[in-house]
Amino acid sequence: MDSPRSLTPQPLHLRRRPRFAICTLGCKLNQSDEADLRRSLRQAGLQEVDFGSEAEVYIVNTCTVTQLADRRSRQMLRRAHRQNPEALVAAIGCYPAVNPDELHAMPEVDIVVGSIEKATVVDEILGRLDWENQAFDSDEPVEHVETRTRRMIKIQEGCRAHCTYCIIPRARGAPRNVAPAEVVRRVQEAIDEGYREVVLTGTHVGTYKWPEGDRTLRLADLLELVLEATTIERLRVTSVGPHEIDERFIALVNHPRMAPHLHMALQSGSETVLRRMKRWYNPRQFRRAVRRLREEV
């Protein structure tokens, strides 16, 4: 039996500028990763096309939170191969992090890269392309996606909570945080590209922390810094928990440039069920946080 394509890499010889297409499934964090990936590939000289078009490189940014998500990821990988059987097809993200062998076994897939190693996928793709690259400008401006008005910017990734039902710690790894200066730089970059709203996203942004001298910066410090250092018209955050709703956070949410919207996940209203899930809050804490937000925001 022939070896899977992902285990027997071969260069792709081209006479034209390679085209790439990305399909992103799942969460806002994946959307942020997609934006970074798109930028890097464009700056390397590749041309972006719609995922339904013919391309030389297809990337499926996968999700694995459910069996349905796994199946959808496989469907998109097979679709990419059907559109151009000679193209490079890359499976990246959470599905490869959890079940890489399943993807290596797919004859349609050339590259398999998990979430933690996702930053290496551009180098891996470029290393597999053999093409004449004189006829492009590597400094061409990066346009934002016309169908989206918000830029997703990752400030944090990973989780160590290990709730009983959740695969995210396996898929995303241990918590890693983005330096405040880098977050500000990315927000300014989004402004320069024409975005008017930025969403600070992560696996659980409420756990954000960064050592700064003799203190530790938390999410509220980061929000304050972004609002002071940039002119972004609307700033939004995701994935906060009830115990992170304190007086300072509420004051920041009331800032005129902060979106009056928060996402707090509630898996169950039963204290027993939440305890069995190993969640880090109880129904009373959730009710108190919601009540306070309704009264003060």
What are these language model-derived features?
Residues L68-R72, M76, W210-V297:
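Conserved AdoMet/S-adenosylmethionine-binding subsite of the radical SAM
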Residues M1-K209, R248-A251, L262, P283-E295:
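Proteins enriched for Cys/Gly/acidic motifs involved in redox and nucleic-acid/cofactor modification
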